Amino acid sequence: SDYIDQSIQGDMVAGVLNGNWIIPTMEAVTENSGKWEITTIPTLDGGEGYASNGGCGLYITANCGNVDLAKSFLAYTFGGSTQTYDNALRDGGVVTTVLKCADSDVYNEGVAFFNNEPIYKQIVEMGSHVPVIEQSDYHFRAGVYLITAIINTVNGSKLDDELANAEQQLRFEMGL
């Protein structure tokens, strides 16, 4: 995308508001090593902002032929030690926010690009502060409207007008 290829990798940004999956894209600009840090999201009220968007889940479907075996497998691979998560990070760049990984040696390693800070431990710790919210079928659409409102505000529109417009559009889509 233009955002990734031109803005981030073209060294045209002062910050990146995104999830941990964007880290390899940032690291591709090797001359920026040591210039980046991980932080929370700014908030309107001045508090610390923690958020999560995306992720994954592991499920045992109704069609599973051996539910007990599937449960045992998941408990063994993902419920015991941090080894599975450590290997996923080290070998594939897959980051978890499972709290026990904050104590893992792998998650506590410094990352050279980020001033040798243990950014993966920081991500896990930040994940522990994300509030639980109820999501609906309109969760992602609401995000699109809010992102548009932010962009329009940055480009000169009034924040209150943009937020009201975003709410109006979402309510219309929801049939309210």
Feature-to-residue mapping (PLM):
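Structural recognition of the beta-strand scaffold that forms the well-ordered cores
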Residues: 14-18, 37-40, 59-60
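Acidic/polar loop patches that form or flank catalytic/metal-binding clefts of enzymes
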Residues: 1, 16, 35-38, 84-88
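Extracytoplasmic ligand-binding clamshell segments of periplasmic binding protein
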Residues: 1-28, 68, 162
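Non-transmembrane alpha-helical segments in soluble domains
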Residues: 5, 9, 61, 70-79, ...
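Solvent-exposed, amphipathic alpha-helical segments
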Residues: 141, 145-156
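Residues that flank catalytic or metal-binding motifs in active/ligand-binding sites
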Residues: 4, 11, 34, 54-56
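C-terminal lobe and pocket-closing loops
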Residues: 22-32, 44-144
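Short, well-ordered loop/turn and helix-capping segments at boundaries between secondary-structure elements
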Residues: 66, 79, 83, 155-156, ...
